[in-house]
C-alpha cells in the first residue's frame, strides 16, 4: 500500500521553511515529516536561511537566493518513501548540478527551455527512487563531473509516495 504527498512550491511546504536556518528545518504534511538542510561549499552554515517564492525553495547565502554553485539541499523523511519526482526551476538561472539518493551514484540534473530564450529553464527529475527513513536525497548545484556549468535554481516541487510496511 502507498499513499501520496505532493508539494507545489510556496503553496505547500516551501513556505514553511521560509526564514528558517539552513542548518536544518522540519515540516510535516499528511503524517510524514520532511527535514531539509542546506550546505554551502560542502559545509553546514548558520549564516544562511531558506527562502521561498513562486518558483520554489532556495538558500539566502547568495544575492540571488537560489541554490547557487557550491550549494546543496539535503532532504530526508521520517518514513520510507518513493521519490517520484523533483521539479527544478532555474528561470533566468542555469540548470546544472547533480542529485544523489543515499549513497548511490550521482546523476546529472538537466533542464529544458521551452522557447530557447534562457529565461524559463526548468526540469522534472522523475523516478528518483526509494528513500529509506533517514536517508538523504541530495540536490546539488555543483557540476556533476566538475567540468559542466554549475547550476543556479530553486526546488520547485517534490512528489513522494509513502511506502507502508
State each model region's role.
Residues 78-86, 134:
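Extended extracellular/luminal ectodomain segments enriched in beta-structured repeat modules
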Residues 106-130:
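Extracellular carbohydrate recognition and processing domains
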Residues 139-151:
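Short beta-strand-plus-loop segments that form exposed binding edges in beta-rich domains
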Residues 1-70, 132:
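N-terminal targeting leaders for non-cytosolic proteins
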Residues 69-79:
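A short glycine/threonine-centered beta-strand motif
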Residues 92-107:
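Short, surface-exposed beta-strand/strand-loop-strand elements in extracellular ectodomains
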Amino acid at each position: 500500500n502507498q499513499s501520496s504527498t505532493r508539494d507545489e512550491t510556496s503553496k505547500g511546504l516551501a513556505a514553511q521553511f521560509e526564514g528558517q536556518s539552513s542548518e536544518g528545518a522540519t515540516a510535516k504534511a499528511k503524517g510524514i515529516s520532511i527535514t531539509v538542510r542546506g550546505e554551502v561549499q560542502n559545509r553546514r552554515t548558520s549564516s544562511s536561511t531558506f527562502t521561498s517564492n513562486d518558483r520554489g525553495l532556495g538558500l539566502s547565502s547568495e544575492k540571488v537566493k537560489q541554490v547557487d554553485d557550491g550549494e546543496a539541499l539535503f532532504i530526508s523523511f521520517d518514513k520510507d518513501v518513493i521519490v517520484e519526482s523533483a521539479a527544478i526551476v532555474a528561470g533566468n538561472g542555469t540548470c546544472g548540478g547533480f542529485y544523489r539518493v543515499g549513497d548511490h551514484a550521482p546523476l546529472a540534473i538537466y533542464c529544458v527551455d521551452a522557447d530557447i530564450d534562457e529565461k524559463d529553464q526548468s526540469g522534472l527529475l522523475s523516478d528518483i527512487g526509494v528513500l529509506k527513513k533517514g536517508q538523504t536525497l541530495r540536490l546539488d548545484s555543483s557540476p556533476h563531473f566538475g567540468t559542466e556549468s554549475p547550476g543556479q535554481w530553486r526546488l520547485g516541487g517534490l512528489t513522494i509516495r509513502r511506502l507502508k510496511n
